[in-house]
Regions:
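Protein kinase catalytic-loop region centered on the HRD/HxD motif
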Residues: 142-152
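Structural motif at the C-terminus of the N-lobe alphaC helix and the adjacent alphaC-beta4 loop
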Residues: 83-92
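ATP-binding glycine-rich loop module of kinase domains
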Residues: 40-79
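Conserved short submotifs of the Hanks-type protein kinase catalytic core
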Residues: 105-118
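Juxta-kinase regulatory segment immediately upstream of eukaryotic protein kinase catalytic domains
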Residues: 1-32
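AlphaC helix of the protein kinase catalytic domain
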Residues: 119-128
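Short beta-strand micro-motifs within the conserved protein kinase catalytic domain, predominantly
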Residues: 96-107
Length: 152
């Protein structure tokens, strides 16, 4: 069962008729959980219906500004993330961007879900293993170096 009913999709995604259409991009996904709520947009865990792939869907709402001049918005932020994911698509250290679409003015970025530990869980689980922490830090330094070599 989807996390949202058709009526809830209409309300939460601020749409009128598009979400109720079977062709709407959001209907390609079974929403499982809201991971994070924010005024700039939410983050959802979902499953792509066509193949069962676990995905993360990031929503960006327009007109949410980050700077005093109003020149950098939440929409710019997530579009920049999509651009970077495309530039780094052949790298093993980034997740794959699988889809992007608009519903009315909201922009959605879809990427494969990567199972693993978040930073706090990693610190807790490796608290007695300095060797693992050092190897992980070395990997992070190598990744940042590789990204910088690409001019990013």
């Amino acid at each position: 069962m989807d996390l949202f009913s058709e009526e809830e999709k209409r309300i939460y995604f601020q749409t009128t008729c598009e979400v109720s259409s079977k062709d709407s991009a959001i209907n390609k996904y079974k929403m499982e959980k809201i991971i994070k709520r924010s005024n700039k947009g939410n983050v959802y865990r979902a499953i792509r219906k066509s193949d069962g792939q676990k995905v993360i869907i990031k929503q960006s709402r327009p007109f949410v500004n980050y700077d005093a001049e109003g020149e950098w918005t939440a929409l710019d932020d997530i579009k920049n993330e999509a651009h970077m994911l495309k530039k780094l698509a052949d790298k093993s250290y980034t997740t794959n961007l699988t889809d992007e679409f608009y519903i009315v003015d909201d922009y959605f970025l879809v990427q494969e879900q990567v199972d693993g530990l978040n930073f706090e869980e990693f610190i807790r689980e490796t608290e007695h293993s300095l060797n693992i922490r050092e190897k992980t830090l070395d990997n992070i330094v190598n990744i940042v170096s590789d990204i910088h070599k690409l001019g990013i």
